[in-house]
Design a protein with these regions (language model features):
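Catalytic core of pol beta-like nucleotidyltransferases
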Residues: 2-81, 85-93, 101-186
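Structural signature of FAD isoalloxazine-binding scaffolds in flavoprotein oxidoreductases
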Residues: 97
Length: 186
């Protein structure tokens, strides 16, 4: 069950779990990386958010995506971002993910083959049937996902900076504006 504590301004699970901070007046997470559970994300960014039916479909794709990644990676972390992690007026197009992969995991060639289609691919050309696409996203475009080697500071800093940027309604970056994002680990 979800409980709202107005005196702290934070949303928390009544039966334990992590705490997702209250959103700012503009419907964004406050700056920083915030630990969250899948259950909390569903409650705050689907059930309590505008466009709940639309978001529910994206979240179902995220749940299946998470299961597929966890079938391959015994441990890891998602950094969850994008319009999905907000209460903006416009519905989110997808859910953005950086998937932090522990380089010490004993991944086989088959594991790598299974991972490739789970990430956003750009400049894709296929021989049969002959097709070309600027961008191919997993889960029918509902997930926009990128692999990150965990523990490589340059990669983690890049994605932290990218996920902290704020875009306006026109899709352009808002200079100087900073927001937060979520972290789900298993």
């Amino acid at each position: 069950m979800i409980g709202l504590s107005s005196w702290t301004g934070r949303v928390a699970l009544a039966q334990g779990g992590t705490v997702i901070p209250a959103l700012t007046e503009s419907g964004l997470l406050p700056p920083g990386r915030h630990a969250a559970s899948m259950r909390e994300i569903r409650e705050i960014f689907v059930e309590q958010a505008p466009h709940a039916d639309h978001r529910r479909r994206i979240f179902r794709a995220f749940e299946l995506y998470s299961d597929m990644i966890r079938d391959i990676l015994e441990r890891g972390t998602f950094w969850v971002d994008g319009g999905f992690c907000s209460h903006k007026a416009a519905p989110p197009e997808d859910l953005d993910l950086a998937v932090l992969i522990d380089s010490s995991l004993p991944l086989t060639d088959k594991d790598h083959e299974r991972l490739i289609p789970l990430f956003t691919l750009q400049g894709v050309q296929a021989g049969q049937p002959q097709v070309w696409a600027n961008r191919v996203q997993p889960m029918g475009g509902l997930i926009d996902s990128f692999p990150v080697v965990a523990g490589i500071p340059e990669q983690e800093e890049y994605w932290d900076a990218t996920w902290s940027k704020v875009k306006g309604p026109d899709g352009e970056l808002v200079p100087g504006a900073v927001k937060g994002y979520l972290e789900v680990s298993w």
